[in-house]
């Protein structure tokens, strides 16, 4: 079972200054339209090769367009022993600010 969080809950955590780890797994052209400012971009296809960059002691919130790809990534990483949360509804439901990808 994958833990879930709503976009509104993520926005609230950011507004409260909580130190949360966000990973956006969308493709480059999707992220070019805007990304949550604190999110790190790792494309879904790159996750297996880049999982070593993640700390198993931290909890990561995964984001995609609708919540489906991020759920798959979260399930994959949970099996590897990572602490994961899926942002349900994805960027389609995100009402907060986005910034251009750096």
Residue ranges and their predicted role:
Residues 1-20, 27-59, 68-102:
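Rhodanese-like catalytic fold shared by cysteine-dependent sulfurtransferases
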